[in-house]
From Swiss-Prot:
InterPro entries: GreA/GreB_C_sf, TF_GreA/GreB_CS, Tscrpt_elong_fac_GreA, Tscrpt_elong_fac_GreA/B, Tscrpt_elong_fac_GreA/B_C, Tscrpt_elong_fac_GreA/B_fam, Tscrpt_elong_fac_GreA/B_N, Tscrpt_elong_fac_GreA/B_N_sf. GO terms for molecular function: DNA binding; RNA polymerase binding. Residues 1-67 form a coiled coil. This is Transcription elongation factor GreA. GO terms for biological process: DNA-templated transcription elongation; regulation of DNA-templated transcription elongation. Keywords: Coiled coil, DNA-binding, Transcription, Transcription regulation. Pfam families: GreA_GreB, GreA_GreB_N. Belongs to the GreA/GreB family. PROSITE patterns: GREAB_1, GREAB_2.
Length: 158
């Protein structure tokens, strides 16, 4: 199993920005907050100090997490791909044969998935089922509610 984490360019850049913000802004601020809380005296009953230390732990943990993800990131370049096959990063419009409705999903990495924004993980049942299929293919997907059948009516790389 590969340790690479597939990411869209947008997601990679967003993670980089979050890391920069945490290092440049949040880390110095929490260090200042700890110093200020320490100056209030007794640390054993100092809620401000405890809160600042907890926040520092969260920030440092998130920094490590982001550094690890970015080090293992594989940015998927969709430039020049013909929109005839579903791959990671594709935006796919499906026709649900049961409900007779169209639905559009962008296939993204696990960290990027947000169903409210129409972004599904490449490891989700629908994402896994779609990858590798072509325009006009019929795809059956086992979901918790049963089996869904979709027809791929459009593939775009945005």
């Amino acid at each position: 199993m590969s340790n690479n984490i597939p990411l869209t360019k947008e997601s990679y850049e967003a993670l980089q920005e979050e890391l920069k913000r945490l290092i440049r802004e949040e880390r110095p601020k929490v260090i200042q907050d700890i110093a200020e809380a320490r100056s209030h005296g007794d640390l054993s009953e100092n809620a401000e100090y405890d809160a600042a230390k907890n926040r520092q732990g969260f920030i440092e943990g998130r920094i490590q997490e982001l550094q690890g993800k970015l080090a293992r990131a594989h940015v998927v370049d969709l430039t020049g791909l013909k929109p005839d096959k579903v791959v990671f990063g594709a935006t796919v419009t499906l026709y649900d044969t049961a409900s007779e409705e169209e639905i559009t999903y962008k296939i993204v990495g696990e960290d990027e998935a947000d169903i409210k924004l129409g972004k599904i993980s490449c490891t989700s049942p629908v994402g896994k089922a779609l990858i590798g299929h072509k325009l006009d293919d019929s795809v059956k997907v086992k979901v918790p509610a049963g089996t869904k059948e979709y027809e791929i009516i459009e593939i775009k790389y945005e």
